[in-house]
Amino acid sequence: MDFKEWFCLNGRESFTIDPKVNPDDARFYFGREEIKNRIKAQLRRSFVEPGVPKMVIYGSFGSGKTQTLFHLEHYLQNECPEACRQTPRILHLDLEMHSKSDHKDWHLQLVETLGKSTVSAWIDRLFSRTQNLDTELRSIFGNVNMAEAAKNLRAGGDIGLLAWRWFCGYELRPNELERLNVTRSLGDLGAGDMVNALVGIGRLAERNEEKLIFLMDEAEQFKNVKTGDATESLHTYLRKLAEPSNSSVGFIIASYALTLDDMAELLVRADVRTRIGENNFVEIPPLPSIKDVEIFLKELLAELIEQNKAEEKIQNESLGVSLETYPFTADAFEVLCEFASQDPTKALPRNLIKAVNECAISAWDERKPIIEPDIVNEIAPLIFG
């Protein structure tokens, strides 16, 4: 009998949760009702004012920041707030920064994540229902160069690719600029120029009944930037994106940090924090008490184990365990919760899930139908010690 059947797993191969591998895992958010409700309330309010979410979440490694991002995507796609009048177009990216990265690198990552085909399709749909595409694009972008480049995205071949390179912020040669009928490369005027183009794309999305929202993970990467001018340009890009006037491009940024001061300095400067709003900086802490650990584990087991099959197995094999803690005996479950809570900084979702999985694998390897205290005593110190 394989591992899945051994523990009556519900359509999965292990106790591991990873929404990057299994998108359906995004629906899970165990043991943190207060934080979940707070973030969702902030999201709902954000579509009223400023019109899109602008938020930073932070916590230690393994605290569940990535799961939070994917869960928020699941929420927006399945329970879209009434105040969001367009369909959310949600895009994930893991930020990558090196010592000399600047606003151009950040902009490129955002635009490339969005993709040429998406923006071109928006322009095509706009063209199909407007009498004057030039006028519409100038109204959307508020800039002649951006409107001309956007119009060229409809073209196939080299000219369409050239227009996309312009929006990505590449420096174009004079003859390439002439082909696009633009007077300069995007970004020649600085970081704000690139933000204006991105916000213009957001307004284009709105004309197509979509709301553009970026979910950016691993923002601790900003600490890799060592050049002063590069850091300032990144800060300017974020400050401009956080301006109240931007109601078209939303963002939720996730960063490793034990406190606000642990984050990259550009994320927490006063001018950024006042624009984003102090209540939109949300900590994802470890589980604070043994009771919270118990709730997390029970909710996890209830979701990942097929309850009817497990109940039948418990009865047929006289396992003498409760369905609430299966496949752990009551004593083993208590021992695991105690280990996890000894050091509050280690009571993290990643550690708890790993402990459950490792204990289950050990029991399966020994052909034991349930997890007893001796297995927990062997595994838990390696994870929480």
Question: Which residues make up each language-model segment?
Answer:
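C-terminal alpha-helical "lid" subdomain
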Residues: 151-152, 274, 291, 295, ...
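A short, basic N-terminal segment
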Residues: 1-55, 75, 372-373, 377-385
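Alpha-helical scaffold elements adjacent to nucleotide-binding pockets in ATP/GTP-utilizing enzyme cores
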Residues: 38, 42, 67-75, 102-114, ...
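Active-site-proximal structural scaffolding
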Residues: 50, 194, 231-234, 345, ...
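Glycine- and acidic
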Residues: 24-25, 53-58, 220-224, 338-341
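The catalytic "switch" region of P-loop NTPases
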Residues: 1-14, 18, 36, 172-328, ...
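P-loop NTPase nucleotide-binding core
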Residues: 48-208, 349, 363-366
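Alpha-helical repeat scaffolds in large eukaryotic proteins
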Residues: 44-47, 73, 77, 199, ...
